[in-house]
Amino acid sequence: MTDHVPINPCTIPQFTGDLDALEQDKNAITAAAGTFRDAGSNVDSEFQGLSAFYSAPEAAQLFATTKPVKTDSDFFADQLESAATALGEYITEARPIVARLKELQAKATAFSGKISGDAHWKDDGDKIDENNDLIHDVNAAVSAFWAAERTCANKIRALYCAPPLTADDGSHGANMYGYKGEDLNKAQDLPWGSQLEETHRAWEIGYWVKSFV
């Protein structure tokens, strides 16, 4: 039988990466894109400059050979810039979610302190509501973070024609990652705690009478 437990601040997911470092990497990718673009353009333009000093029947064909260098460099630079843009949008979207998860962990810690040592806290409907509201808030934040990850990954995956990631619908199929908030809300027990119901003890006559009316 599953042991339903209140929200546990220690198991609320927290971002363990470094968004500032990721932003630096994003900027480096953008700079690299410019370097590739300029290098390809320079190879072509400098080679074309030799046309003033070379004249032969095959000259046109010869000087056309560097056009693909410029074209391919532009294409690769475009790919890098698209990836950098996806990362930048992810960073912007992730920052408030990361802060929200920290805030919820602090709230859950305070709630845990409030019910600590109280064997009958589940008799208090307000505390049950507070627990369940915290669970729902964590569900919303975690699912929003998964969605941000999927969105970023899918923009990058599209660059090399990989299939998009989708939210797991419970079937755990290929290319599924994370869950939607509404689906998490349907689960009673989650890694960060359980949705609970108020308990009623034998002497709460009013409750038991109403339950049979």
Predicted regions located by residue number:
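N-terminal secretion-targeting helices of virulence/extracellular proteins
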Residues: 1-179, 187, 204
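Hydrophobic, gly/ala-rich membrane-insertion helices/peptides used by toxins and envelope proteins
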Residues: 185-213
